[in-house]
Regions:
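Cytosolic-side transmembrane-helix boundaries in multi-pass membrane proteins
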Residues: 313, 324-325, 374, 381, ...
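Single transmembrane alpha-helix segments in multi-pass membrane proteins
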Residues: 202-246, 279, 283-293, 432-435
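Membrane-embedded helix boundary and interhelical linker motif in transport proteins
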Residues: 233-279, 458
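Alpha-helical transmembrane segments within multi-pass membrane transporters and channels
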Residues: 257-303, 309, 443-448, 479-480
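Extended repeat-based scaffolds of very large eukaryotic assembly and lipid-transport proteins
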Residues: 1-165, 169-197
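Helix-loop-helix "hairpin" substructures at the membrane interface of multi-pass membrane proteins
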Residues: 336-414, 443
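Inter-helical junctions in multi-pass inner-membrane proteins, predominant
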Residues: 201, 338, 359-360, 364, ...
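Pore- or pathway-lining transmembrane helices of multi-pass membrane proteins that form conduits
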Residues: 235-239, 288-311, 349, 418-431, ...
Length: 493
């Protein structure tokens, strides 16, 4: 008998599905069939686990013609351990995890030896985690009070939120001394979980803030340079995301299944979105200098064109496959995880900020860009080719949005109007931080992200957004120019 058939036989014996026929043949019964006038059960071979046949057809028989195979209490306990050992040795980690979960919370003590043996052999991190929890739960039924208290401490140290309820419910069935330890460990674990949840809220705020900063950096450059409220900036993000999707489709055609497409798509997302930004400036905005209302309406029209074009080409919903390196996350505790994809976005934003700061403050292009932002006419008189600076700035702003779109494929679907979710918040970041101010953009973006995620656990998302907008309005009443006041042409006008 092979291992799979042996494991199935043990489970059948444990569940009372092994019987004898009138001729004394040992069989395993399947589910009852009530389609006829009386119930019948199919029979299986206990050795091979395959269906038995009689006359070339599946053998079915009335349950009344079968006799039970008696299994005593001690034998049933041995069967539980043996069955658990078979289930816990399954080659599939997901099956092993499911097997452990089936023993929780009340069956762990009956199969504790099998759980301990499985823990000593387990290599998979996820399965080891739940095995440790199951062993600690099983040891709560230890024969001595010392063993029970030690198990409670280990259970609390593992950090699983379900242990709080478990310890408090078990406190009523033990001695007062042990119950005191149970309650103390439950309170200790609850406080730890609350603290870790606050850390997770801060992390979520930093993650949202990083996305807003990544989108708003390009918007701040364009708005600070040309004074244009670019309503198509969210669509630059969408262009970067769809470029990633196209690269994935091309790779799946010639090299299916790999993750290299994601990294290859990075420069193409930046270049494509940057070129769309240059095209927008050349075709539309250069004709509308110092006409802010017309510029706003024109960019809004361009955004509608880009959205409908994407919808016509790709449909309403597409998705980009997440690279295997970004699956899972860093576990602060059993119930608190920091996803790798969002950690990557935070790191990406930090790197992008460093590169942008270098471009703006350590290169001739940055010097000319800042000069044009401060005073376009004087810069032109000094020989700066302002039209060329405009093109490069729009390429940089669009490229940063394309970079954000590339990163956004890690945390959401790719849809034609995906930029709408961030364009308003990005404008809030730019205005609150100060027009064209990189440091202000970072502070405002992170602040808005943290406040948004901090309000969500207390208020609903909609009410949290209303409160956030109210706070920004009050702040702008005190500092109309934002955290850092702009200088140059924007201030003069």
């Amino acid at each position: 008998m092979g291992k799979p058939a042996y494991a199935k036989f043990l489970l059948s014996l444990h569940d009372g599905d092994v019987h004898k026929t009138s001729s004394g043949k040992l069989v395993v019964t399947g589910e009852e069939d009530w389609s006829g006038s009386s119930p019948v059960v199919p029979l299986e071979d206990p050795v091979t686990g395959s269906p038995l046949e009689q006359g070339g057809v599946p053998w079915t028989i009335s349950p009344d013609s079968l006799s039970d195979l008696p299994v005593g209490r001690e034998d049933r306990a041995l069967l539980e351990t043996a069955s658990a050992g078979q289930a816990l040795s399954d080659p599939d980690p997901a099956a092993r995890r499911t097997a452990v979960e089936s023993f929780l919370p009340d069956g762990a003590s009956s199969v504790l030896p099998a759980l301990r043996e499985a823990l000593s052999k387990e290599a998979n991190k996820s399965v080891r985690k739940i095995l440790k929890y199951a062993v600690a739960v099983g040891e709560l039924d230890a024969a001595t009070d010392t063993g029970k208290m030690s198990a409670a401490v280990r259970l609390s140290d593992l950090g699983d939120a379900s242990a709080v309820t478990l310890l408090r419910s078990r406190a009523a069935a033990v001695s007062p001394e042990v119950a005191k330890v149970y309650r103390h460990q439950a309170d200790r674990l609850e406080q730890r979980i609350k603290f870790l949840e606050k850390i997770q809220v801060v992390f979520s705020g930093l993650s949202l803030g990083s996305i807003l900063v990544l989108v708003a950096m390009g918007l701040a450059i364009i708005y600070g340079l040309a004074g244009v409220i670019n309503m198509a900036h969210g669509e630059f993000l969408m262009v970067g995301a769809y470029t990633t999707y196209v690269v994935q489709s091309l790779f799946d055609r010639w090299h299916p299944g790999g993750d290299a497409f994601f990294w290859v798509a990075l420069p193409f997302s930046i270049l494509t979105a940057g070129c769309v930004g240059v095209l927008l400036d050349w075709a539309v905005l250069r004709h509308l200098h110092k006409r802010p209302l017309e510029s706003l309406l024109a960019t809004w029209g361009v955004s509608l064109i880009l959205v409908q074009t994407a919808r016509s080409l790709f449909g309403d919903l597409t998705s980009v496959r997440q690279p295997a390196i970004f699956t899972g996350g860093y576990d602060l505790a059993a119930s608190v995880t920091l996803p790798w994809n969002r950690l990557f976005i935070i790191v990406l934003t930090t790197v992008a900020l460093g590169v942008l700061a270098y471009l703006l403050y350590r290169t001739r292009f940055g010097l000319r860009l800042r000069a044009v932002v401060q005073n376009r006419d004087m810069s032109a008189c000094l020989g700066v080719r302002t039209a060329r600076v405009d093109r490069m700035a729009f390429f940089l702003g669009g490229g940063l949005a394309g970079l954000a779109g590339w990163a956004m494929t890690l945390v959401g679907n790719v849809v034609p109007n995906m930029g709408d979710s961030y364009i308003v918040d990005s404008f809030l970041v730019v205005v609150t931080g100060g027009v064209g101010k990189l440091a202000g953009t970072v502070i405002a973006g992170m602040g808005i992200g943290l406040v948004t995620k901090g309000l969500e656990p207390v208020f609903e998302a909609v009410y949290g957004k209303v409160i956030l907008l109210g706070l920004i309005i009050l702040f702008l009443q005190v500092r109309p120019t934002g955290i850092f006041a702009p200088r140059g042409r924007g201030e003069d006008t």
